[in-house]
């Protein structure tokens, strides 16, 4: 039996990453620390981007763009301060923007994820660097909503792929 990995496989992994992120967000809202789920979501997203970049038969432009998104994701992990938050907020909109550019009808998902990333980034930066600790609940709530938006986008991409 030979395993065949297609875009549909990797979009499923993106859906799993969004689900892990959502579970972590619900745990944080409940006062628990499930940060390992966020690390799992980060790893799944990174692996997915790498495998999308390495897919046999894809164009050089695809490889370059997916690998570039992987580099931005790594910068979000290795970076410090506000730059890391900004790099983190660029990955999913960048991925969805590229998929939209390739002709996938995901304009609404792209708009929702982009808006959710901007709002979440704003609230996180105000909480961490602006000293507005009272906004931390709203930043965490926006994290859950952002994970839901990412999940919807990943599910849409998954459903658009033909069964292979």
Predicted segments with their positions:
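N-terminal topogenic module of multi-pass integral membrane proteins
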Residues: 1-51
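Cytosolic juxtamembrane helix at the C-terminal end of the final transmembrane segment
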Residues: 3-5, 52-57, 94-109, 148-164
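Hydrophobic alpha-helical membrane segments
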Residues: 16, 87-98, 107-131, 139-146, ...
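Membrane-interfacial loop-to-transmembrane alpha-helix junctions, especially the N-terminal start
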Residues: 5-14, 56-67, 105-113
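Membrane-proximal helix-loop-helix units in multi-pass membrane proteins
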Residues: 62-111
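Alpha-helical transmembrane segments of polytopic membrane proteins
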Residues: 34-46, 82-92, 136-147
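Internal transmembrane alpha-helix with an interfacial aromatic "cap," most often the third helix
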Residues: 37-65, 92-103
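Juxtamembrane "helix-exit" motif on the non-cytosolic side of transmembrane helices
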Residues: 22-31, 75-79, 123-134
């Amino acid at each position: 039996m030979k395993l065949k990995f297609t875009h549909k496989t990797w979009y499923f992994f993106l859906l799993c990453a969004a689900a892990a992120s959502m579970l972590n967000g619900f745990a944080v809202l409940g006062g628990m620390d499930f940060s390992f789920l966020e690390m799992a979501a980060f790893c799944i997203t990174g692996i997915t981007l790498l495998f999308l970049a390495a897919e046999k038969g894809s164009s050089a432009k695809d490889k370059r763009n997916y690998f570039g998104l992987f580099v931005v994701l790594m910068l979000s992990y290795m970076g410090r301060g506000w730059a890391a938050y900004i790099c983190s907020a660029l990955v999913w909109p960048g991925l969805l923007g590229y998929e939209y550019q390739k002709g996938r009808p995901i304009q609404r998902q792209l708009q929702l994820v982009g808006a959710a990333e901007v709002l979440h980034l704003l609230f996180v930066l105000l909480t961490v660097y602006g000293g507005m600790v009272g906004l931390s609940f709203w930043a965490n709530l926006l994290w859950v909503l952002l994970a839901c938006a990412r999940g919807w986008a990943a599910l849409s991409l998954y459903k658009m792929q033909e069964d292979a």
